[in-house]
């Protein structure tokens, strides 16, 4: 998983509330588990027209927002069914951060596990970012995870993130990789635990 320490890029506004995972990644793209080619499926029904041509009215197809690194999203982004493909697709599309007010819980967890930062801000800060994101001349920002700051051409906005989430994103590690760094302690605990309670390791007797 890629590390996240300080990243600069364009931010695209997608402020509609309750954008769910079916909008982010339609069901026809959920067949594979190899995480390949999912960038095509992201917002497919909005990015493309019926004939397959790019929709010129969709924000991520417009000049100045086509390669957005960050999305400024509406409340409850990522609601709906739990489908990690939605996060995989966003990551493959080049999205490294989502900034909004609230995120669906499981979707938020999936973002962390896959190296996408989610930042929750208050409404005044979001309104100021929305003004900047609306223009291709001012939609560049820098997000520092070390300082927990978003820097624009006009101001620096601080955000709050749990220390565990920040450390895992900065290290580029998911929950398994993060846990494995404590493997010696886990193994020592296991030895001590079963030495005090050896009956717990005995095979179960068959029921007759």
From Swiss-Prot:
Gene3D superfamilies xref list: Aconitase, domain 4
Pathway where it operates: Amino-acid biosynthesis; L-leucine biosynthesis; L-leucine from 3-methyl-2-oxobutanoate: step 2/4
Catalytic activity as recorded in UniProt: (2R,3S)-3-isopropylmalate = (2S)-2-isopropylmalate
GO molecular function, one term: 3-isopropylmalate dehydratase activity
GO cellular component: 3-isopropylmalate dehydratase complex
Keyword entries, A-Z: Amino-acid biosynthesis, Branched-chain amino acid biosynthesis, Leucine biosynthesis, Lyase
GO biological process: L-leucine biosynthetic process
EC number: 4.2.1.33
Enzyme class: lyase
Family listed: Belongs to the LeuD family. LeuD type 1 subfamily.
Assembly mode: Heterodimer of LeuC and LeuD.
HAMAP family, A to Z: LeuD_type1 (MF_01031)
PANTHER family in the record: 3-ISOPROPYLMALATE DEHYDRATASE SMALL SUBUNIT (PTHR43345:SF5), 3-ISOPROPYLMALATE DEHYDRATASE SMALL SUBUNIT 2-RELATED-RELATED (PTHR43345)
Protein name (database record): 3-isopropylmalate dehydratase small subunit 2
